[in-house]
């Protein structure tokens, strides 16, 4: 438990930030799932448009520090490899 007034404020702030980060991580997972569902349905154009949008969101969150830049690169690379395997 926080002892000082500033520690209590810091605790509140960290809780708010954790909630915000969880929301953003959930958003990223949703965009990734949209690409994967488009790949599963074998819809190349939908997969590519969803990939472009997902790529933009992942890069933005990697710049903000939500995820590591190497994880962002790995995710984009693996997802695009799945799209390429469709024969795109």
Swiss-Prot record:
Any one GO CC term of the record: small ribosomal subunit
Pfam families from the UniProt entry: Ribosomal_S20p
GO molecular function annotation: small ribosomal subunit rRNA binding; structural constituent of ribosome
Name of the protein described by the UniProt record: Small ribosomal subunit protein bS20
Any single GO BP term: translation
Keywords attached to this entry: Ribonucleoprotein, Ribosomal protein, RNA-binding, rRNA-binding
Gene symbol of the encoding locus: rpsT
Protein purpose: Binds directly to 16S ribosomal RNA.
Homology family: Belongs to the bacterial ribosomal protein bS20 family.
Record carries keyword RNA-binding: yes
Ranges for region Disordered: 1-20
Source organism, top-level taxon: Bacteria
This protein's record includes keyword RNA-binding: yes
InterPro entries named among the record's database cross-references: Ribosomal_bS20, Ribosomal_bS20_sf
